[in-house]
Amino acid sequence: MLPEQIKNFREMVTLKDKAYVLLRPMVREDESRLIEFYSMVGGDDLCYLHHDVKDPAVIRDWCEHLDSGKVLPLLAFDHEHIVASASLHFYEGPKRHIGEVRLFLARDYRKCGLGVKMVRALIDLARKQELSILMAEIATEETKMIKAFESLGFKTQATLDDYFMLPDGDLHDVVLMTLPLRMQTEEF
């Protein structure tokens, strides 16, 4: 169950074009809006997503089985329409101190600062969950996204050759980036 501080999280962010977007955690009632949002996704964007978001059953499953102990999904709304999705994935066992960040923005909401603001919100939420490290996997050709994560303090830890396979079987390299969340003892 979500702690109250996360469950009640709401943040209105201002984009570069002065538009306002609301960030809040996903709830079960977002199913139809998510189906609408992902129905617009096509082409290259589909290749990089972890799930078949065009299948309404996938979205329905997400909404019906929300488990904040495994995934904390954060949505961005422009009025009543979802324009971006970010998620914080939790691990168990020896990786329980690590969270993984994933992010997807509608094409019209890229290059306006929304992605950085959403990842910042996930960083804050991860700290509230007392995680030690955040990680992100980004295809090496996504240089602008890599730079955006670097601007937030993420560092490249490794490049994984042929780590990501597109639907056509084409292999791509991925950079593994991490952000330490706990202050070192010499910091104050």
Language model features with spans:
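Conserved GNAT acetyl-CoA-binding A-motif
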Residues: 119, 126-138
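Acetyl-CoA-dependent GNAT
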Residues: 51-107, 180-182
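C-terminal "cap" of GNAT-fold acetyltransferases
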Residues: 162-188
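Helix-loop element at the rim of GNAT/NAT acetyltransferase active sites that forms part
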Residues: 31, 36-50
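A short beta-loop-alpha structural element at the N-terminal edge
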Residues: 21-33
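Conserved catalytic-core motifs of GNAT/GCN5-like acyltransferases
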Residues: 135-138, 150-172
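Conserved beta-strand-loop-alpha-helix junction that forms the acyl-donor binding cleft
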Residues: 110, 136-146
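Conserved acetyl-CoA pyrophosphate-binding loop and the N-cap/start of the following alpha-helix
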Residues: 109, 113-121
